[in-house]
Every structure is written in C-alpha cells, then in structure tokens.
C-alpha cells in the first residue's frame, strides 16, 4: 500500500513539472485591431504589407514570447463606420492596439476613443496636421505630418522667385488642416485659396478652374486626395491650364500616390508638374521586400496589378515597431476593467472598458528605434520624422528627381549635395523656360496714356500717319517700361491714348470702370483719385511749388563785398593784422634798419608790412628768426582767409543774381497779381483754397506757354507759375538764368501709375520702382530726359548760402595766436636774459629807473646783431680798398646844413646796376652815449 502511494506521488509531481515546463514555452497573444477600407486598392495594398510584417517579424524572432494576432474590420469608406469598427474591436475583442484610421477624416473620433480606453491607435496614412491638436498620448502618427513639407515648398518658391500662388485644396479636414501651415511658410508670398468639395462633379471643378484662369495667378499648389487631384489635372489640361506659363506643384501624399492611380497612366496627365515627397532610401531589404510583396499581393488579388507605395512601407514598419513594443512591455495586465462586460451593446459608449495594458504599451512603443523599410523609424512627440524630401518633376511616364531638401542644407541638386540649386525642369507645355508666375489675362495689359498739349518730355503720343499706330514716349513711359522688366512675370502692355488731356480725373476713373487695366503718365497721386484706383509708389519728387522770375540786378549792392564775412570776423581779422605788425616791429626794430626811424615812420612801416601780407606784397625783409616764424604762420592764415573770402564772395554775387521777384504767396494774393497753373491739373483747386480769386488764375499747357506768360510780367502776364515740382524742375533745367523756384512747397503724392483696386500689379510695380530707385536707374532716366546745363547753379543751394563767421576760423586764429604768443615769450625771455645785469646790479637806482634804462636799451640798435656787424665790415672795406667808381657814376649829394659843424658823412651806394652805380652821402648820427649809427643801405 505504501509502495502504491509512493508511486502515485512521483507520478503527480512529474505531471506537475511537465505542466510547468510546457507553460514556460507558451506565447502570449496580443490582439491588434486593423481598421481599413477593404474595398479600396490602397487598403488592400497596405493590408498585404501588414500581414507580411507580422509573418516576417516572427520568422526572424521565433523566440519572442509575444505574438500579434490581427483582427481586421472594414470601415467601408465611411467615417461613422470606422468609429463603429474601432468601438467593436475594443468592446468585443478587447484589442491592445488599433492600426488605423486610413484617412484624417476618420481619425477624430477614433483618437478620442483611444484616449478614453487607453488603447494606442497607430495611423500610417492620416497626415493632417489638425490631428496633432487633439492632445492624446495614445494617438501615434507613424507617417509624415503634412506640415513638415511646407518649408520645402517655401524653398522652391524662393528659388524660382514666385510671389503669388493659389492653393487648391479639398474642403475637408485633410485640406483645411494643411492651409494654416502653408500660409505661415509662405509669408513673403501672397497666397489665395481655391476650395474644391470632395464630392465635386466635373462641371463644378471646371467652373472653379475657369475662375482661376481669369485671375493673374499662374502658380498653383494642389493638396487633396489623389483621386480627386487626378480629375482636377485632367480638366485643367482640357481647358488649357497645363500649357506654357503655368506652374503646378503637388504635396507629399499626392506625389507618392499619383503613379498608383489608374495603373500609372495618370503620369501623362500631369506632365511638367512638380511634386514634393518624403525620401525613401534604397536598400537591399527594400528591394527583396518589393519582389515578395508583389508575388503575395498578386496571389491575394489576382485581378489587380499595382505597385508598392510608401504608405504600405509605413504600415509594415508600424507593425514591426508594435511587435517590438509588446515584447518589451509588461504582459501581466493584458485585460480590461469591468466596464466592457456591463453591456452587450457593441455601440454603447457609456460601458466601454479601459485597457490596463495600454499605458505600458504606449510607453514602450514611443521608445522603439530601428531602421525600417521606409527609413529610420523614430518617433518624436508621437510623430514620425522625415529628415529629407525629394523634389520631383513628372516628365512623360517618369518621375525625375531634380533635387532634395533637408532642414539643415535647404535645397540641393540631385547630382551634387554641394550645389544649392535644382536640376533642369520640364514645365507644362514641355517648356524649359522658368515661368514668371503671373500673367495678365488676355495676354496684354491695356494701358491708358494721356495725349498732352505740352510737357512732352513726360508723355508724348506719336501717331504714325501710315499705320495710324500710336507710340507713347517720354520720361514716365520709360520709367514704366523699366519697371516692367523688373517684374517676376511677363506683362505685354497695349497702349491706348486718352483724348481729353485736361481731365486726368476722368482718365483715372476709367480704370475704375475697367476701360483700362492701368493708366501711365504724369498722373499725380491725390486723395480723390485714390478712391477709384490704387497707385504705385511715386517715381518723382512730390510737391507743388512756385516759380518766379529773378530780379534784373545790373547794379549790384554797393557793399556786397562785405557780405561774405560777419562783423566779428572782420573785426578779429583787422585786430590780428595790427597785432602782427606790432609783433614784427618788436622783433625787428633793433636789428633791422627798415623798421627804424621816427615813431610815425616805424608805425607806418609796421602796419604797411602787416597789411601788405594780405596780397603777399610786403617788400621789407625780416632778419630775426622769430619774426620769420611769425610771418610764415601769419601768411598761412592769410592764405586761408583770402581763399575763403573769394569763394564766399563769388557765392554771394551769384545769390544776388538769383534773387526772386516774389518770395511770399500772401503778397500775390494781397496784390491780386495773376498767377499761372497747368491746365487740367489739380493745382487750380490748391490755389483757390489758398485764397486766390478765379480771375487771378491763368492756365498754361506747356513750358513755352509758362515762359511767355512770365516774360510779359505781372501786368500783362503772370507774376508766378504754380505747378508740380517735377514740371518746374524741367523748366528750370533749360531756363535757370531766368527763373527760380521758391518756397513754400505744398506736399502732394507725386507721380504714380494707377491700377484697379486690389490689383496685385500695384504692389509689384511699387517694388519694381523701389528697385529702380535704389539702383539709380530712375536718376539715369531723369538725366536723359531733363539734362541740366553745366552753367546752371542749383537755386536752392545758392539761396541757402550763409556768411562765414568767426566760429568758422576760430581754430585757425587760435593756432596763430598761440604760436605768436609763444614767440613773444621767447623774445622777452632772451632780451631779459641778455640784459640781466641791468636789473640785477647793486646800484641804488630805483626799479623804475632801471626799467626806463632797460626800455632805452630796447629802443636802440642791437650792435651785436650780425646785420650791423656785416654793415660795419662793409663800410670799412669800401671804397678805399676796392675799385674806385668812375666819376661818371659817382654822385656826392651834400647833406642839408645843420647846427652841427662836425657832422660826418657816409658814402651810400644807391645802385648795383652793372652799367651804373650811384652813391649818396648820409650823416653819421652821434648819440649822447657816444655810439654812432653807421648805415649802409642798398637801394634797388
């Protein structure tokens, strides 16, 4: 009995151990729901990839303890049915994750359901950016968000310099979610909208496209489902919108899917179209998978022939990532709470359960990283990232890659990553010329041009007598045609003349009633005219001013020569002349006989020397170094002063010749003088507003008429002419000596071109005018039409001349004064040092007597000077020891009798002419101190 019990015990233990071993080798089943539109080719392609992903993954990982089991539901291409299918999977199958939805419209409710039940919902094809705004950690986008491509699109626009675009999009969540991001990326581009309903019939699409043909836009960005986009392109081709000059650009999803619609035959419809699509790197694994997928798909769907698309690759990678995540996540909580068992109604939202496995699965899924078939699988904030986009050009049945775009490098050539450019493009109509992006409907722009009676330099219409063709020329026309060349698109103008030149208001109004597409000429921008048309930026100087004759000043102002300098400058200069004469006398009178003699003689000589430097005519020689230094400094000052005075005097004489006869408008009104204005201009309204009477106003039609009226004077003609500054400058450029333009200037808008309200051409032409102005083209055109005479001074500059005042030369006088003062100090110091014994002797004389004696010494000759030493030697050696002049060349002139009978005489040579020498005698003066002056002067 004991033996039987022992055997039974061993048998039970062995059975239990076998059960434990078998339990360790069992795998956990993870239910995964799949919601697809099973009747569509797109969903069948993706479902094949999903099934192959499960099979391939576990074939490569046989030891994994988890297994995905797929539960597929058909959404029947209906948003409500897709939501019902997801709810059924959660309530009846208690799935741990859902693959779907297939499009963005089905996603809204499914995301909210996933958030409530904590069931991760993974989409590989819903790309609308609006889904990101639904904050749910359980929604994972394993595909590219449409907003990630807008920067690549913006780079294309910048590269081709397109400034206008029409965004054609489908009227649902898929289309509307993309538009805000496109608008933000194209901030420098004007974006217009065109909405196509998802159920639109061909007639509705054609009607919308014909509206776009009537606009000026020729660049279109298309964002909609591929099937609808194909119809749009087919209709666009039928009505002529796929011809030369048009630009079509498709977004990412459409570019990927166009080849798969209608079995690839759709590429002929979209020839010349550009596209942006996410880059899928080539690999051996991808090539092998394509072959296997094609065999599997044709086996499952024998009647279908299609190719693998990028969304099927993302579906494959999504399943691979999910399989990795469930293996990593904790599988101990693979159940729902009791909520799902409270009701058997599959659509009862109130009793839906909550997955306890969801949080750990969501966390594990967000951390998965690997290189999949579509590239790197890496989620950031629940979204797949695409670091690279391809720029595609559809040519024939080919998809040519013409470039790439990355966030770091921007656009790159497809053949070289170093080139920031794109490859050659074949545009619609098989054109190789880059479209400018805009075109005027009807091919030509009807431009109204006024037929003027004068001022033909601005606008002139010439009529060919044979062909009756009208050709406009002039400054305004050349500015307009130069601006045309700056536009990023082709505009062909058709000029039509306006036969009422005296009524520019009517001319502008005809832009409002669509008679003209634009008005070009000398059209002044006014507030009243801006009510009916939009104006470009002005291309001329703005303002209305007054032109008057200049005075006939044959007799100039008597004292005009004093005008260049101010009073303080005259006084300062005169004081410096006196000061310089005094300083030179101080330095020279002890060593230079030219500065000696009676007091009045010394004063006259000093002043003569100083003032003669004004014209550099001083003949006295200076012998002391200090005096020479002072003279050099002062001559420089005099040079600057005289040159400045000459220039200023010339300016003042010019100003006098340009003095206007009238300077005040109020004087004209008060004196009831007649004034002129250009007929048909708004200037008449300004003059009436200032207070002029109707009988004071006389119109003129041309510059010659204005000249005739002004020449007659105010008694028979006019006292002043009022007009736009541009007209007055044109007159002055040829008659600068007769007239002058004076203040005040009444501000106006200047000349501009008129376009219909809200016309995009207004902004384009304004930018073109700015470019012309910045590049100096406007000034060059103005110089050609209004050349200035070389001898014409600028009246505004001449009338603004100012006197030169002391502050203009304060630095110069400061330098000269400092140098002269320094010389004085040196001179005084040397003199005191030389006669220091006079002040420092031990005699009992008072300081006053010593100073008097010192001044007496200062007034005497400095016999120690080299000048007097040389003279003494010269007198001793002549004429005894030298050749005696012949009697015919020597004249002895007796000195007048004086009380002194012992006066000595010296023989003075008064001529060193080779043919004649004359000598004169001059007494030798004896001083009280026993010294004598011996003078030997050479006169020439």
Swiss-Prot record:
Main location class: membrane
A Pfam family per the record: Lig_chan
Cellular location(s): Membrane
Subunit structure: May form heteromers.
All ranges on the Cytoplasmic side of the membrane: 588-596, 618-628, 833-940
Name listed for the protein in its UniProt record: Glutamate receptor 2.9
Topology, Extracellular side: 24-566, 650-811
GO terms for MF: calcium channel activity; glutamate receptor activity; ligand-gated monoatomic ion channel activity
Family in the record: Belongs to the glutamate-gated ion channel (TC 1.A.10.1) family.
Gene Ontology BP annotations: calcium ion transport; calcium-mediated signaling; cellular response to amino acid stimulus
Tissue specificity comment: Expressed predominantly in roots.
Region (Disordered): 876-900, 914-940
Residues linked to a glycan: 25, 39, 115, 338, 345, 528, 771, 776, 805
InterPro entries linked: ANF_lig-bd_rcpt, GABAb_receptor_plant_PBP1, Ionotropic_Glu_rcpt, Iontro_rcpt_C, Iontropic_Glu_rcpt_pln, Peripla_BP_I, Solute-binding_3/MltF_N
Residues in the signal sequence: 1-23
GO CC, one annotated term: plasma membrane
Taxonomic superkingdom: Eukaryota
Transmembrane segments: 567-587, 597-617, 629-649, 812-832
Keywords: Glycoprotein, Ion channel, Ion transport, Ligand-gated ion channel, Membrane, Receptor, Signal, Transmembrane, Transmembrane helix, Transport
Membrane topology reported for the UniProt record: Multi-pass membrane protein
Function field: Glutamate-gated receptor that probably acts as a non-selective cation channel. May be involved in light-signal transduction and calcium homeostasis via the regulation of calcium influx into cells.
UniProt keyword Transport present: yes
